[in-house]
């Protein structure tokens, strides 16, 4: 089963309705397992060229869009944790490695599609067939666990995104509401204002829960693309306004450390990996292209654009605000109506994007669950699982209300596995029997070791910071936590 973020356009979308009485979309997929591939034949996809599909430009836009979320707003704080020189350089290196690992995944998937005469292969299937191709008998016998491991990390990653979104929504809405009485029309000075205390940020998280429940009950991916389009527009406008502001009156950079303490670097690593975690969208995009032979070039171009945007936003944001930078750069904007509207636009965009991120774990878990019950219980079970999952993300966000640490934790735990650890190992298992140079094996081992070290150290550091903050401020709001 292909599981990914939406890459379809809104064409042909019907009126928005919950459609709770029809069978779940996942149930229909179980009844017709070949429906995913529409009318394509294996011979058509073997040539990597289709009569229908997205163009090169559309694939580029979708790839860039898949990397734009809350992660980019947290990168200035990440650079603070690494240093004004070390941070951008590390982002450049990590962007190159992440792009290389995406190329590895595409190369391995194309090899198995050609070898097995299949039209499409998702991340989990590619890893499973990679283990089957390995000469080790034990790995061959347990190859199906490769797909399960990928599915597990995809679930953790996407639900982690959802938790980050809830914390982001609460932090930004809380700041807007508290500053509403002192908001001015003067956008040229970022004066310190006395905020009017309101309810705890955790209550803001709960206030979003009914809207999130309604969104996740929309099970038609084509309808969700409407929300995707609205989210893209609102976030694009917000990013343009933010970049316009931070490029004004940049202070002297010499006051900032070139290299920060090594103790905070793991937090940078987790946040950076979180931002580059779009490897799950790569194979579905490649499959949807009219001519997939162009995809490697599109992947390189798209990730170059994304890396440049990340470095620019991260460096300029840290230069502009220095040690006062917060977990999301939107929280540093002046207290005028223009920049308050930026927060509201981003809130609307993230709220719409939540359903698309939620779609991925839902389409992994729900088909597995409803395949074990009768047809009459398929719909109630589908809706119940969605309700439990969205409540779980809200509960986790309430338990861990620090936006910067949630981002770093999600990136360290699951982002490193999907983006850095698994792809190099997959290349070894796929091509080892065909002969690989020692240099390639060394390169793959080095990347996987780097990912594993980042996984262990980044997770430990994020949890340690979280426990320290809870001990110091057990009942504080999340905005108080932001340094």
Curated annotation (Swiss-Prot):
Abundantly expressed in kidney and muscle. Expressed in the S1 segment of the proximal tubule close to the glomerulus. Residues 1-58, 103-148, 219-222, 286-296, 371-379, 426-437 are cytoplasmic. Residues 80-81, 170-197, 244-264, 318-349, 401-404, 459-483 are extracellular. It is a multi-pass membrane protein. Residues 26-46 are annotated as: Disordered. It catalyses: glycine(in) + H(+)(in) = glycine(out) + H(+)(out); L-alanine(in) + H(+)(in) = L-alanine(out) + H(+)(out); D-alanine(in) + H(+)(in) = D-alanine(out) + H(+)(out); L-proline(out) + H(+)(out) = L-proline(in) + H(+)(in). The keyword Transmembrane applies. Residues 26-36 have a biased composition (Basic and acidic residues). One of its GO terms (biological process) is monoatomic ion transport. One of its GO terms (cellular component) is endoplasmic reticulum membrane. The chain crosses the membrane at residues 59-79, 82-102, 149-169, 198-218, 223-243, 265-285, 297-317, 350-370, 380-400, 405-425, 438-458. PANTHER family: AMINO ACID TRANSPORTER, PROTON-COUPLED AMINO ACID TRANSPORTER 2. Belongs to the amino acid/polyamine transporter 2 family. Electrogenic proton/amino acid symporter with a high selectivity for the small side chains amino acids glycine, alanine and proline, where both L- and D-enantiomers are transported. Extension of the backbone length, as in beta-alanine and 4-aminobutanoate or methylation of the amino group, as in sarcosine and N,N-dimethylglycine, are also tolerated but decrease transport efficiency. A free carboxyl group is preferred. This is Proton-coupled amino acid transporter 2. The gene is SLC36A2.
